[in-house]
Amino acid sequence: MTNIRKTHPLLKIVNNAFIDLPAPSNISSWWNFGSLLGICLILQILTGLFLAMHYTADTTTAFSSVTHICRDVNYGWIIRYMHANGASMFFICLFMHVGRGLYYGSYTYTETWNIGVILLFATMATAFMGYVLPWGQMSFWGATVITNLLSAIPYIGTNLVEWIWGGFSVDKATLTRFFAFHFIFPFIIAALAMVHLLFLHETGSNNPTGISSDADKIPFHPYYTIKDILGALLLVLALMTLVLFSPDLLGDPDNYTPANPLNTPPHIKPEWYFLFAYAILRSIPNKLGGVLALVLSILILILMPLLHTSKQRSMMFRPISQCLFWILVADLLTLTWIGGQPVEHPYIIIGQLASIMYFLLILVLMPVASTIENNLLKW
């Protein structure tokens, strides 16, 4: 008799996705981040659910309710810090996952890639709204500054911002709606992740060589289930080390001061995972120009399949492109550093150069390098 996992309508789906799925035999640890992102999402939904049981989305009590969670709720402190630092781990995994896609040419699976970009946008929006909820100084001013960027949109800008705020400033209405959206978004992300997986399984996974692996497939279980478990253990180890030894390492001290609309912090900056985009935004002196550059810095990922001029899919055998890729990584690290610095002399010009370099690398240098490599193959 056929095994129930192959016949049962529900188990059949799980079986085809996680057990009998034919996978390439040579995918490296860079392919672990998909499953790690799934684990991060589940962890964030669970810790977030327990936080929501004790949190109040009201300007007068939000800050106090977070303090109450940390001081009075059983293990509230660990739930709160797992949720806050879980977001950091989530973004580390996201950046690695996207970087892997860029390096190995996984963006040629256009449907999977485009849904991935939408997932990235949705996750960034969710993280931003979550950062507003503790209602500290950086929460309030971060919300004010970032939502205000929409006022740069011609004609409808001001109306749009006031519509999002639910008033003439960031206030109770804003906090309440941000909490509502922050709660619902992870479930939308989970649904999109399933669609992401659905499209991936139409084609099967890419592999480091970028060459079809149809001739050499192995079952997902036990090979990649055990590999994913190892990845998960390392992720949890990293997360719990952060949570238990230095939970506030990646946070901003200003967020331990309750929100005060009358007092602006000296340096308004977002969480570390948005600093690269924030640096690009700040490097353009024009408001609308900055906002466009900010959006394009992420949206540019959608153009990747169109910018692919190489005859080879992966960068594994393309040394010039490899070199440019790692320069791009260094450039993003530079932008992240600049985003956290005050707007002063050396930092302004470094930020502007790094921003120009970012777009130049993706739009010009990498496609040109690919064309050069194509011609070198003829020799």
Curated annotation (Swiss-Prot):
PROSITE patterns, A to Z: CYTB_CTER (PS51003), CYTB_NTER (PS51002)
Binding site for a ubiquinone: 201
Cellular component GO terms, alphabetical: mitochondrial inner membrane; respiratory chain complex III
Binding site for heme b b566: 97, 196
Location relative to the cell: Mitochondrion inner membrane
Keywords: Electron transport, Heme, Iron, Membrane, Metal-binding, Mitochondrion, Mitochondrion inner membrane, Respiratory chain, Transmembrane, Transmembrane helix, Transport, Ubiquinone
Main location group: mitochondrion
Positions contributing to heme b b562 binding: 83, 182
GO MF term list: metal ion binding; ubiquinol-cytochrome-c reductase activity
Protein's membrane topology: Multi-pass membrane protein
InterPro entries: Cyt_b/b6_C (IPR005798), Cyt_b/b6_C_sf (IPR036150), Cyt_b/b6_N (IPR005797), Cytb/b6-like_sf (IPR027387), Cytochrome_b (IPR030689), Cytochrome_b_C_euk/bac (IPR048260), Cytochrome_b_N_euk/bac (IPR048259), Di-haem_cyt_TM (IPR016174)
Cofactors, names only: heme b
GO biological process, one term: mitochondrial electron transport, ubiquinol to cytochrome c
Cofactor, how bound (note): Binds 2 heme b groups non-covalently.
Ranges that cross the membrane: 33-53, 77-98, 113-133, 178-198, 226-246, 288-308, 320-340, 347-367
Quaternary structure note: The cytochrome bc1 complex contains 11 subunits: 3 respiratory subunits (MT-CYB, CYC1 and UQCRFS1), 2 core proteins (UQCRC1 and UQCRC2) and 6 low-molecular weight proteins (UQCRH/QCR6, UQCRB/QCR7, UQCRQ/QCR8, UQCR10/QCR9, UQCR11/QCR10 and a cleavage product of UQCRFS1). This cytochrome bc1 complex then forms a dimer.
Functional summary from the UniProt entry: Component of the ubiquinol-cytochrome c reductase complex (complex III or cytochrome b-c1 complex) that is part of the mitochondrial respiratory chain. The b-c1 complex mediates electron transfer from ubiquinol to cytochrome c. Contributes to the generation of a proton gradient across the mitochondrial membrane that is then used for ATP synthesis.
Record's protein name: Cytochrome b
Species the sequence originates in: Leucocephalophus adersi
Originating gene: MT-CYB
